[in-house]
Regions:
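Surface-exposed substrate-engagement region within the catalytic domains
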Residues: 78-113
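Ser/Thr/Pro-rich, low-complexity mucin-like regions
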Residues: 215, 299-304, 310, 321-401
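Glycoside hydrolase catalytic-domain groove-lining segments
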Residues: 1-87
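Loop/turn elements at helix/coil->beta-strand transitions in domains of secreted/extracellular proteins
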Residues: 63-68, 112-118
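Surface-exposed, glycine/proline- and aromatic-rich loop segments on solvent-exposed faces
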Residues: 186-305, 368-392
Length: 431
């Protein structure tokens, strides 16, 4: 490229390749600054839809005098999202494997339409060791290879997945209860029962409540992880517990189920309060036993008043604690890799990614410490037990939370390879 710059004057009158044929340099706009070419673009595709990716590719191809190959293009199947695409819907994360395949095919069509010579999908396989800007504060970056952080989008751009378990995962959230055993049970009153298991990616729960009837009633699962904070009362839902809970899992139908976190233990507040509320989170922190529980959100875009001139603009966030209903078994015809929970009569089967519960390194059972007590941000403590309960919200007394033992796996990671649905989509496209 340096040689091109040095010899640009000599090349001014030479013909160039426009992606389809050899034409004069003046016809293509080759060498024109990209910023100028962007001002000339209309940003629409052939169907009349706004497509900034195609517009960028057209400009990039016009700027150069040689064939252009797009060295990487891709989207992530991670549960977490780092950026929302405003016009094509090809988000950086929170896309199912089928949506990933569709997005890759659309990107390839744009690459070909723009006149580029080709491109390379990013990437062949998932990468557990990766980090991303809107979750890296929440995890131990020295330990990311030893667990699968489904909240970090950067780890899941691959066409090949590394799923937990040597041959299969310990649980598939699909409504088939045959994989659950008596050893998994934490409590069983006859009218209610709760079981738990876990692997390198998720905590899995199976909850039974008499009369639940595929979500006709509500169900609440309080969770206590840290001894430093938590509340015995959840103001949001009017729930009382016999231990201070840090999270409440609210199963409220297919469309309104979510995990909420006690305000004191909300990591977004501790790390991004200035960006979201233009204030210092540490000047007046919530009480350690505050009964207010908040939606769990991820930062998507920090405000840019210097660029926009809007000094009242707040940063963009989205609710990552909201749960998606569906079948999460890869062998099922209705498989949705983003599905969090499914009903099965009076049962609900669900999975929670570790980071959503403020685990910084589950391979060592390391969680977030209190952000405000002699700390300034995310520090870690280690636990060997968490506590969970189950209620329909109509109990007169306090809901009992039962212990669940946690055992770290250290560096001994179990995984198996699986081709994603997006692999099949690209194979069909490139046949």
């Amino acid at each position: 490229y340096l040689n091109y710059i040095l010899n640009r004057a000599e090349m001014d009158n030479k013909p160039v390749w426009d992606g389809k044929a050899v034409v004069s340099r003046v016809e293509t706009g080759a060498g024109t600054p990209i910023s100028e070419l962007l001002r000339q673009e209309d940003f629409y595709d052939g169907a009349g839809a706004v497509n900034t990716y195609l517009a960028y590719l057209r400009v990039l191809r016009r700027h150069h005098t040689m064939p252009v190959v797009i060295s990487e293009f891709g989207v992530s199947t991670g549960r977490g999202m780092a950026q929302r695409d405003q016009n094509t819907g090809r988000n950086q994360g929170h896309m199912s494997e089928q949506e990933q395949g569709q997005a890759l095919a659309e990107c390839w069509e744009d690459i070909m339409t723009s006149g580029c010579a080709g491109g390379c999908v990013f990437t062949w396989q998932d990468e557990w060791f990766k980090r991303t800007w809107n979750t890296m504060h929440a995890v131990n970056l020295q330990r990311t290879p030893y667990w699968s952080d489904y909240q970090t989008n950067e780890q899941y751009f691959g066409l090949l997945s590394f799923d937990p378990g040597e041959e299969e995962s310990v649980c598939y959230v699909d409504g088939d209860l045959s994989e659950w055993t008596e050893e998994d049970k934490l409590l069983d009153t006859g009218e209610r029962a709760l079981s738990m298991k876990y692997d390198e990616r998720y905590i899995y729960l199976l909850a039974y409540q008499e009369g639940f009837a595929n979500g006709e009633k509500r169900m609440f699962i309080p969770i206590d992880t840290t001894p430093k904070t938590g509340s015995t009362y959840c103001e949001n839902y009017g729930l009382r517990f016999d231990r201070a809970a840090d999270f409440v899992l609210a199963i409220d139908g297919r469309e309104n189920s979510r995990l909420v976190v006690q305000e004191r233990y909300e990591v977004l507040r501790a790390m991004f309060y200035h960006e979201t509320h233009d204030d210092d989170a540490y000047l007046d922190p919530p009480d350690a036993d505050t009964p207010l529980f908040k939606p769990i959100e991820l930062m998507l875009q920090t405000a840019t008043p210097l660029l926009t001139g809007n000094w009242q603009a707040s940063s963009e966030v989205y609710e990552t604690g909201r749960l998606l209903y569906g079948n999460a078994n890869p062998s099922s015809p209705d498989f949705n890799s983003l599905a969090d929970f499914i009903f099965a009569g009076d049962y609900v089967e669900l999975k929670l990614p570790w980071q959503l519960l403020n685990f910084a390194d589950p391979s060592r059972m390391s969680i977030h410490d209190d952000y405000y007590d002699d700390n300034y941000g995310v520090e870690y403590i280690t636990i060997d037990t968490m506590y969970l309960g189950l209620t329909d919200g109509e109990d007169e007394g306090r809901t009992a939370l039962c212990p669940a033992a946690l055992e770290s796996w250290g560096n001994r990671v179990a995984y198996h390879e699986r081709l994603k649905a997006s692999y099949d989509a690209m194979r069909r496209l490139w046949r």
